[in-house]
Amino acid sequence: MKNTFILGIEGTAWNLSAAIVTETEIIAEVTETYKPTAGGIHPREAAQHHAKYAASVIKRLLAEAKEKGVKPSDIDGIAFSQGPGLGPCLRTVATAARMLSISLGIPLIGVNHCIAHIEIGIWRTPAMDPVVLYVSGANSQVISYMGGRYRVFGETLDIGLGNALDKFARGANLPHPGGPKIEAYAKNATKYIHLPYVIKGMDLSFSGLSTAASEALKKAPLEDVCYSYQETAFAMVVEVAERALAHTGKKEVLLAGGVGANTRLREMLNDMCEARGAKFYVPEKRFMGDNGTMIAYTGLLMYKSGNTLSLEDSRVNPSYRTDDVKVTWIQEEKMKRVPEISPGTSLKLGELLDNGAEAIVYLEEGPEGKKILVKERVPKAYRYKEIDERIRTERNRTEARLMSESRRHGVSTPIIYDVEDFKLKMQYIDGVPIKYLVTPELSEKVGELVGKLHSAGIVHGDLTTSNILLAGERLYLLDFGLAYYDKGLEARGVDVHVLFQTFESTHRNHEALIEAFKKGYRRTFIDSEDVLTRVEEIKKRARYA
C-alpha cells in the first residue's frame, strides 16, 4: 500500500516550520525562528520574517526529502496552520500553502494549531484517550475528546501561562524567552513567597499572579520570586488537570505546548498522576514547541478522513477555537468511556466512595449506627507544602461555613456535623451525581438552585455536574470549597460560565441543558438576565489572544 505524504507548514507566531510526514515517519523538518531584537513578539515583524524565509524553508525541506527518496510529486496534500494565531503570520503561511497547493495540484488542509499539539502528543506517546493539559504562550486549556470534538473543560480567563511568564520575565529584565530563565533562577531559591492562587472551577486566572509576583520583586530576591511564581502557577494548572481527570474518570494525562518543556511542571504532573493511578505522557521536547511536524501529521489524519479545503474556504482564523473543530478522524467506538452507575449501589463503611481532585470521601459509623460521610482533604504531593496546607485549611473552613449558609437560603446541601483542620463530617445522602443522568428537566432545577444561591450573595465557584447530586426527587449542591460571597456580575457570570463549560465538554445535549438552566435561573434570580449577558462576554473573552 502506498504511503500518504503530507507537507505541513506552521507559522502562528515565532516559528516558521515545515515538515513532510507519513503515517509512521517524519521524512524531514526545517525551522526558522523569529528572534526580536528586544521585548516580546511583534506580529508584523514576525510575519515579515516568515515571508522572508518561506521559500528557502520549503526549498530546503524538499531537498532533504529528495535525499530520502521523496519527490514533490509524491506529496498528497498541503497542510497549514489555519489558526489560532497572529493574523499577519497566519496569512503569510496560508499564502505559501496555497501557492504550493496550486503548483503541485494537490488539496489544502486547514489545521487547528491547538489540536495539532494534541495529535502530535498522541502520535509520539502511548496515550489513547487522555485529558490534555495544553499550556503555551497564548493558550492554557484542559481538553479531552468527546462526541466528535475536542472539548475544553477549563481554560485561562485572561492571559495564557506562557505569555504570563514572559510578561513577568520582561518586568524582571530577563531575556526572551522568559520561561527557561525563570526555571533556571527558581532552582537557586531559598524561600517561598505567598502569591495569589486563583482557580474558578476548572478555569484559571494568571493576571493577578503576575502582578503580585512583579510587586514581590521590590522586596524579595529574584530567585525566590521565580520559584514562588512557578510553584503557584504550576500547582494551579495541575489541580485543574486533576479536576478534569476526576470528572471524566479518564486514566491518562498528556502534556502539550511549549510551557510543557519545563521540568518542574512535568514533575508535578507526574506526582499527581502517580497519586491517582493515572498514566502521564509527554512527547520529546522537540514536539512541545510549535513545529511543522505537528501540522503535517494532523493534516494527514484530516486528509485520510476526507477533510480538505478549497482555495475559497482557506481563509485563516486568528481566533480558531479547539472546540470549533469537527474531529472526523477519531473512531468513537474505540474511545474509552466513563462507566455509568445507578442509585442503590451498596457501599461499605470505610470504603473509598470518591477520590476527587480536592479530597477523598468515605463512610464511617455515627451515633445509632447512622452512616456519616467523611470528606478528607489529603496532602497533594505536587504542591509546595505551604501552598497545600493553606489551600486545604481555607477550603475546609469555607465549605463548612457556606454550605450551612446556603441551606438557610433554601439550597439543599448535606448537613455539616463536625469540622476538623482538613476533614468534614456530614450527612450521607444516597444519590447519584447528575453527570451520569442529567436531562433538560434536571438542568432547569439546577438553574433554580443556582438562582437561589446567587440571590443569597453566594458564588459556588465550582459548578460542575460532578458536584450536584440527585437523591429521589431532590437535587443537592456539594463541594463548596471554592465558594465565596460576591454579589458582582463578574463573579456570578464566571460561576454560570463554569457550569455551561461543563455541559459543553461532557454532555452531548449541552444546548438543551443550557437553555433549560436559563429557564430555571430566571425563575429564582431577579438579576438573571444581566448575569447571562455577562456569561456571553466571558465566553468571548476566553479566546486565543
Curated annotation (Swiss-Prot):
Cofactor: Fe(2+)
Active-site residues annotated for this sequence: 462 (proton acceptor)
GO biological process: tRNA threonylcarbamoyladenosine modification
Residue span of region Kae1: 1-329
InterPro entries from the UniProt entry: ATPase_NBD, Bud32, Gcp-like_dom, KAE1/TsaD, Kae1_archaea_euk, Kinase-like_dom_sf, Prot_kinase_dom, RIO_dom
Sequence positions that bind Fe cation: 113, 117, 134, 290
Domain Protein kinase: from-to ranges: 340-545
Cofactor: record remark: Binds 1 Fe(2+) ion per subunit.
Keywords attached to this entry: Acyltransferase, ATP-binding, Cytoplasm, Iron, Kinase, Metal-binding, Multifunctional enzyme, Nucleotide-binding, Serine/threonine-protein kinase, Transferase, tRNA processing
PROSITE patterns per UniProt: PROTEIN_KINASE_DOM (PS50011), PROTEIN_KINASE_TYR (PS00109)
Binding site for ATP: 353-361, 375
Domain of life: Archaea
CDD domains tied to this protein: ASKHA_NBD_Kae1_arch_bac
Chemical reaction(s) catalysed: L-seryl-[protein] + ATP = O-phospho-L-seryl-[protein] + ADP + H(+); L-threonyl-[protein] + ATP = O-phospho-L-threonyl-[protein] + ADP + H(+); L-threonylcarbamoyladenylate + adenosine(37) in tRNA = N(6)-L-threonylcarbamoyladenosine(37) in tRNA + AMP + H(+)
GO cellular component: cytoplasm; EKC/KEOPS complex
Molecular function via GO: ATP binding; iron ion binding; metalloendopeptidase activity; N(6)-L-threonylcarbamoyladenine synthase activity; protein serine kinase activity; protein serine/threonine kinase activity; protein serine/threonine/tyrosine kinase activity; zinc ion binding
Major localization class: cytoplasm
Function: Required for the formation of a threonylcarbamoyl group on adenosine at position 37 (t(6)A37) in tRNAs that read codons beginning with adenine. Is a component of the KEOPS complex that is probably involved in the transfer of the threonylcarbamoyl moiety of threonylcarbamoyl-AMP (TC-AMP) to the N6 group of A37. The Kae1 domain likely plays a direct catalytic role in this reaction. The Bud32 domain probably displays kinase activity that regulates Kae1 function.
Similarity remark: In the N-terminal section; belongs to the KAE1 / TsaD family. In the C-terminal section; belongs to the protein kinase superfamily. Tyr protein kinase family. BUD32 subfamily.
Description of how the protein assembles with itself and partners: Component of the KEOPS complex that consists of Kae1, Bud32, Cgi121 and Pcc1; the whole complex dimerizes.
NCBIfam families on file: arch_bud32, arch_KAE1, gcp_kae1, PRK09605.1, PRK14879.1-3
Protein name: Probable bifunctional tRNA threonylcarbamoyladenosine biosynthesis protein
Organism: Methanosarcina barkeri (strain Fusaro / DSM 804)
Organism placement in taxonomy: Archaea, Methanobacteriati, Methanobacteriota, Stenosarchaea group, Methanomicrobia
